[in-house]
């Protein structure tokens, strides 16, 4: 049976990437514990507007754990302490206790500048994809499903890699602000398939170069990214990216 909880929420306020930020505090009362976290933020904004205050800005879209837009640092954890394989939108207030203090912050990364409050600019991920996360080969009309024989294990693993939604939790969790889990997942989803092998060397080099130029840090294998990934991507992808990159450089 659902119960109501009351708590204090501290949420980050910042007008832009070059402005100083601060925390605002608001008391929330009688919130049903079957309310989602984003629904709770909607209630917060209704209360702020009724008080004549500016609403709190945060990113969201599908609210179905698909799009990766809901990027919030909740009580020191990207997406909060959700079930394994879930984003902020799948976090429910039953995860919190009556009287808690809940702290909400944006992704903290030089490569993700703050647009306003907890909404950040993640165009850097798009630029990494533009650097090589695709195939340029003209394939014509759709082939028969069995025209190119691919082992089921490879197809399954490529699908797992492709499930990365680009939310940026890996970057937010990493002490170095590294995007290696994201980049390696996007490289792996193509490297595992014959259609992606033709441009594999160029793809690995260009995407790693773009990642470095955009201000992301280097990977030091702390595995924090793997622990918070809502789609359960693993550092096996990072190992594969390293192999692809080394092979590409040796072939130069």
Short names for language-model regions:
Residues 24-36:
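Short, contiguous acidic and Ser/Thr-rich linear segments
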Residues 53-54, 69, 73:
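Long, hydrophobic/aromatic-enriched structural stretches that serve as scaffold segments
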Residues 35-54, 102-252:
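Ferredoxin-type iron-sulfur electron-transfer modules in oxidoreductases and energy-metabolism complexes
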Residues 4-27:
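Eukaryote-biased recognition of intrinsically disordered, low-complexity regulatory segments
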Residues 12, 29, 74-76:
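Short strand-turn-strand beta-turns centered on an Asx-Gly dipeptide
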Residues 74-97, 101-104:
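Glycine-rich phosphate/adenylate-binding loop and adjacent beta-alpha elements
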Residues 57-69:
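Short, structured protein-protein interaction patches enriched in aromatics and acidic/basic residues
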């Amino acid at each position: 049976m659902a119960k109501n909880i009351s708590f204090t929420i501290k949420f980050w306020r910042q007008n832009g990437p070059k402005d100083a930020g601060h925390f605002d505090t608001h008391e929330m009362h009688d919130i049903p514990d079957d309310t989602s976290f984003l629904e709770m933020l909607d209630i917060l904004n209704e209360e702020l507007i009724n008080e004549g205050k500016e609403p709190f800005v945060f990113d969201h879209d599908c609210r179905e754990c698909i799009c990766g837009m809901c990027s919030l640092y909740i009580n020191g954890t990207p997406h909060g302490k959700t079930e394994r394989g879930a984003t902020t939108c799948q976090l429910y207030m039953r995860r919190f206790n009556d009287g808690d203090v809940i702290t909400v912050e944006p992704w903290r990364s030089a490569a993700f500048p703050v647009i306003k409050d907890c909404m950040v600019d993640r165009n850097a991920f798009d630029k990494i994809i533009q650097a090589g996360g695709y195939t340029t080969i003209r394939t014509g009309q759709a082939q028969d499903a069995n025209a190119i024989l691919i082992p089921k294990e490879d197809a399954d693993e490529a699908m797992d890699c492709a499930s990365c939604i680009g939310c940026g939790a890996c970057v937010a969790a990493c002490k170095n602000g590294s995007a290696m889990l994201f980049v390696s997942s996007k490289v792996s989803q193509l490297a595992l398939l014959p259609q992606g092998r033709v441009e594999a060397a160029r793809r690995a080099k260009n995407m790693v170069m773009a990642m470095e130029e955009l201000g992301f840090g280097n990977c030091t294998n702390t595995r924090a990214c793997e622990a918070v990934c809502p789609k359960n991507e693993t550092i096996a992808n990072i190992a594969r990216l390293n192999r692809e990159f080394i092979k590409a450089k040796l072939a130069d």
